[in-house]
């Protein structure tokens, strides 16, 4: 792969949480004169450095890292907002002749990078909040039944238990009078040409991944994750805010309230992380085509990529 930098314009690295993709990203950025750009929707938030496993100074290996920890936890941050920042960064890096190395576990970010993003309309906060409240009170199936009457085409594509997508479809319909499919047909510009990108998905063996997850979550508590959650809770944010949904926040919050012991919080947090990793693995296998190279992290770090 000596001619890699001449053959491609970007490196994309994804994989489940705790898979070792961050270390691989640093290695490849060092080798090809690049920078690392965050592609994880939780690592953008400033308060939760430890709990979201953002790389620290020693792990950055002297490589510049961008789009990490720059969003206040009380601010909503969409895929579109991330894509706009990524586009500006890529344009600058191309002028400077530096390689963008995208690293993260948010599959939608990579899909948007290489396929463009639908130009979705703004939805008033009041509409979104009201529908989310109804979801909690009435359940996803009731709202899916309503969606079937208003937008049968979308209802057929969305599972009756997928509350988040059901609410999204309903809020767009209510705000604009048009089905969400109308907006999904139009796509924004492609930022990264997939045919000129090195694309890697890191997929460790499940026992190895689970062992890493278990060790890492326990270590986080000793490294300051409890203090991070305490600071986050002091902001008194609504539970719907994305930062409040970060894995470990609710378990540590329960521990701080005396509702869980430390051991219970560790087990519950690790269990939620394992479930999340399983969903990520399923998504990567189903959504990433054969042009993505599937490797194990140990193999990746040992090879001359």
From Swiss-Prot:
<feature type="binding site">
    <location>
        <begin position="17"/>
        <end position="22"/>
    </location>
    <ligand>
        <name>substrate</name>
    </ligand>
</feature>
<dbReference type="GO" id="GO:0006400">
    <property type="term" value="P:tRNA modification"/>
</dbReference>
<keyword id="KW-0808">Transferase</keyword>
<keyword id="KW-0067">ATP-binding</keyword>
<feature type="binding site">
    <location>
        <begin position="15"/>
        <end position="22"/>
    </location>
    <ligand>
        <name>ATP</name>
    </ligand>
</feature>
<dbReference type="InterPro" id="IPR018022">
    <property type="entry name" value="IPT"/>
</dbReference>
<keyword id="KW-0819">tRNA processing</keyword>
<keyword id="KW-0460">Magnesium</keyword>
<comment type="similarity">
    <text>Belongs to the IPP transferase family.</text>
</comment>
<comment type="function">
    <text>Catalyzes the transfer of a dimethylallyl group onto the adenine at position 37 in tRNAs that read codons beginning with uridine, leading to the formation of N6-(dimethylallyl)adenosine (i(6)A).</text>
</comment>
<protein>
    <recommendedName>
        <fullName>tRNA dimethylallyltransferase</fullName>
        <ecNumber>2.5.1.75</ecNumber>
    </recommendedName>
</protein>
<dbReference type="InterPro" id="IPR039657">
    <property type="entry name" value="Dimethylallyltransferase"/>
</dbReference>
<dbReference type="GO" id="GO:0052381">
    <property type="term" value="F:tRNA dimethylallyltransferase activity"/>
</dbReference>
<dbReference type="Pfam" id="PF01715">
    <property type="entry name" value="IPPT"/>
</dbReference>
<feature type="site" description="Interaction with substrate tRNA">
    <location>
        <position position="106"/>
    </location>
</feature>
<dbReference type="GO" id="GO:0005524">
    <property type="term" value="F:ATP binding"/>
</dbReference>
<feature type="region of interest" description="Interaction with substrate tRNA">
    <location>
        <begin position="40"/>
        <end position="43"/>
    </location>
</feature>
<dbReference type="InterPro" id="IPR027417">
    <property type="entry name" value="P-loop_NTPase"/>
</dbReference>
<comment type="subunit">
    <text>Monomer.</text>
</comment>
<keyword id="KW-0547">Nucleotide-binding</keyword>
<feature type="site" description="Interaction with substrate tRNA">
    <location>
        <position position="128"/>
    </location>
</feature>
<feature type="region of interest" description="Interaction with substrate tRNA">
    <location>
        <begin position="164"/>
        <end position="168"/>
    </location>
</feature>
């Amino acid at each position: 792969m000596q001619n890699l930098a001449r053959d491609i314009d970007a490196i994309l690295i994804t994989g489940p949480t705790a898979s070792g993709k961050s270390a691989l990203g640093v290695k490849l950025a060092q080798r090809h004169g690049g920078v690392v750009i965050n592609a994880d929707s939780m690592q953008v938030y400033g308060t939760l450095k430890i709990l979201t496993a953002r790389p620290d100074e020693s792990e950055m290996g002297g490589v510049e890292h961008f789009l990490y920890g720059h969003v206040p936890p009380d601010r909503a941050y969409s895929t579109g907002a991330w894509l706009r920042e990524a586009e500006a960064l890529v344009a600058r890096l191309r002028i400077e002749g530096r390689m963008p190395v995208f690293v993260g576990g948010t599959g939608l970010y990579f899909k948007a990078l290489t396929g463009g993003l639908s130009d979705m309309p703004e939805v008033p906060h009041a509409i979104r909040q009201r529908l989310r409240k109804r979801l909690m009170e009435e359940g996803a199936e009731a709202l899916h039944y309503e969606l079937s009457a208003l937008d049968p085409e979308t209802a057929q594509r969305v599972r009756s238990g997928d509350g988040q997508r059901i609410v999204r479809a309903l809020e767009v319909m209510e705000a604009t009078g048009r089905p969400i499919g109308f907006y999904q047909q139009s796509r924004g510009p492609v930022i990264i040409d997939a045919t000129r990108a090195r694309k890697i998905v890191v997929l460790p063996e499940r026992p190895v991944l689970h062992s890493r997850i278990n060790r890492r979550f326990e270590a986080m508590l000793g490294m300051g994750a409890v203090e991070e959650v305490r600071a986050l809770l002091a902001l008194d944010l609504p539970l719907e805010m994305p930062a409040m949904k970060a894995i470990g926040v609710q378990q540590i919050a329960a521990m701080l309230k005396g509702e869980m012991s430390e051991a219970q919080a560790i087990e519950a947090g690790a269990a939620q992380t394992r479930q999340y990793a399983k969903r990520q693995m399923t998504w990567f296998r189903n959504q990433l085509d054969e042009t993505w190279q599937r490797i194990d992290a140990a193999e990746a770090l040992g090879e001359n990529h």
